[in-house]
């Protein structure tokens, strides 16, 4: 044996086999899927461009009221005060995730864990 490779399959045979497979399956096209990580990177770019708040306002407001209830009952909040708390909370979380990502990169990891 001279180590020669097996002869390549002819393109015509390949195309004929593909059309036969489509005919067998009834021509149903499977939905398009992006490679793992592509959508994640697109979302990262999208959210880094945006400036709007990412936590829904009402659930955050309920959380603020629930926490405040432990210290004093019947507290009232100006809407701007709740928005200021939300801005601060989201800014803190963004900074935390940035630091977490730097730590993950330093440890030669890709995924961050809680």
Curated annotation (Swiss-Prot):
GO CC annotation terms, alphabetical: nucleosome; nucleus
Annotated segments matching region Disordered: 1-31
Domain of life, source organism: Eukaryota
Location(s), subcellular: Nucleus; Chromosome
Keyword Nucleus appears in the UniProt entry: yes
InterPro entries linked: Histone-fold, Histone_H2A/H2B/H3, Histone_H3/CENP-A
GO molecular function: DNA binding; protein heterodimerization activity; structural constituent of chromatin
Oligomer status and interactors: The nucleosome is a histone octamer containing two molecules each of H2A, H2B, H3 and H4 assembled in one H3-H4 heterotetramer and two H2A-H2B heterodimers. The octamer wraps approximately 147 bp of DNA.
Known function: Core component of nucleosome. Nucleosomes wrap and compact DNA into chromatin, limiting DNA accessibility to the cellular machineries which require DNA as a template. Histones thereby play a central role in transcription regulation, DNA repair, DNA replication and chromosomal stability. DNA accessibility is regulated via a complex set of post-translational modifications of histones, also called histone code, and nucleosome remodeling.
Family as reported in the entry's similarity comment: Belongs to the histone H3 family.
Protein name: Histone H3-1
Annotated source species: Stylonychia lemnae (Ciliate)
Protein encoded by which gene: H3-1
